[in-house]
Design a protein with these regions (language model features):
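Alpha-helical transmembrane segments in inner-membrane proteins
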Residues: 1-360
Length: 360
């Protein structure tokens, strides 16, 4: 009977892994690759869904049009063709507005939840939509300005005022911010309504806008808004990696060398620009910014480097889908803002009841 091998002999006999050998699929590198691959797949799937939503938005409505005919209307329109005129004159502008406004609201909601660490935060619940709406209503009633390219400046100022008021009242605490947003909204919405009711011309021009309709605007309306959308998008992507540190807490983020105040300031400017532009385009649409970030984190995880781009894709998917549903359920159409609110309300209730509101 042979004596058992000594520990030294066993250590010499056992092969050591080569440092040059790549980690297997169950190792850390494999896990990173698997996670990254899944996230890329989710992003690609979202892009495909957005393209499908755009195609359906162009084809569906009170008067349905085949996809082949829709494509011809885009690339080789026939003069006098009713379907082509409807697609190019009505459905293309409302689809573009739905995509841009949805992306802006999705991004603004994701940033708002990140900097407040509040799962209930979105531009509507924080009062930014109400502030932007008040600015745009003042532009229409006091100065006769209804062109979105000009009124967006008033919307930006109104959203900025609401943002400052909410953070001044809420002192940065998640629950207090939600209450402050409700207070600011309760203050600004009646003022906007009163101003509109006192000015019949402004009311007639903004009545569909006030309920979140994507109609009544043409492609030229986007011309004055793209700087706000571009600034908001660039800032959102720039601060995305910093939001991961902020999610760990202000003290941890500061210990990692991050300027917490600068991150919140840049994200705040992005939120105000995006909320102001979205409101100028499509009116005060609520709860899109609430639903989209929750869906993005569920699909792709908590890494804001991926959450932020996904929010920019899921937002237009939701808003364009809401617009399509509104066209189909009623012959005289239901505004996208109303349908989006009907979709978002159950999510708001579920989040409020199923999770701690203390923070993300």
């Amino acid at each position: 009977m042979e004596p058992p091998a000594s520990p030294e002999a066993s250590a010499q006999a056992s092969p050591e892994p080569s440092p040059e050998a790549p980690a297997g699929p169950t190792g850390p590198a494999g896990a990173v690759r698997t996670g990254r691959g899944r996230r890329v797949a989710v992003i690609v799937a979202a892009v495909v869904l957005l393209l499908v939503a755009v195609a359906l938005s162009l084809a569906l409505g009170v008067r349905g049009v085949a996809l082949r005919e829709t494509w011809q209307a885009l690339v080789d329109p026939v003069a006098g063709n009713v379907d082509h005129d409807v697609i190019r004159g009505q459905r293309v502008p409302r689809t573009i507005i739905g995509v841009l406004a949805g992306a802006a609201l999705g991004l603004a909601g994701g940033l708002a939840q990140a900097i407040t660490r509040n799962p209930l935060a979105d531009p509507g619940l924080l009062g930014l939509n109400a502030g932007a709406s008040l600015g745009i209503v003042v532009a229409a009633t006091a100065f006769g300005v209804v062109n979105p390219g000009v009124s967006v400046w008033f919307g930006f100022l109104g959203a900025a005022l609401a943002f400052v008021l909410v953070f001044a009242i809420g002192h940065g605490r998640p629950v207090h911010l939600a209450l402050a947003g409700a207070t600011v909204t309760a203050l600004m919405v009646p003022i906007s309504t009163l101003l509109l009711f006192r000015d019949v011309d402004a009311f007639n021009q903004l009545r569909f806008w006030s309920v979140g309709a994507l109609t009544g605007r043409d492609v030229d309306a986007v011309a004055g808004l793209w700087p706000f959308l571009l600034v908001g998008l660039v800032l959102a992507l720039f601060v995305a990696h910093r939001l991961n540190g902020l999610a760990l807490g202000d003290d941890v983020a500061a210990a990692l060398g991050q300027s917490v105040g600068t991150t919140r300031l840049l994200a705040g400017v992005a939120i105000v620009a995006l909320a102001g532009a979205a409101t100028a385009l499509a009116g005060p649409i609520a709860l899109v910014g609430l639903v989209v970030p929750h869906a993005a984190r569920r699909l792709i995880g908590q890494d804001y480097r991926w959450v932020v781009p996904l929010c920019a894709l899921l937002g237009p998917i939701l808003l364009v889908a809401a617009d399509i549903i509104g066209r189909l359920v009623r012959q005289d159409e239901l505004e996208a803002g109303v349908v989006a609110a009907l979709i978002g309300a159950p999510v708001l209730v579920a989040v409020a009841r199923g999770r701690r509101v203390a923070g993300l």
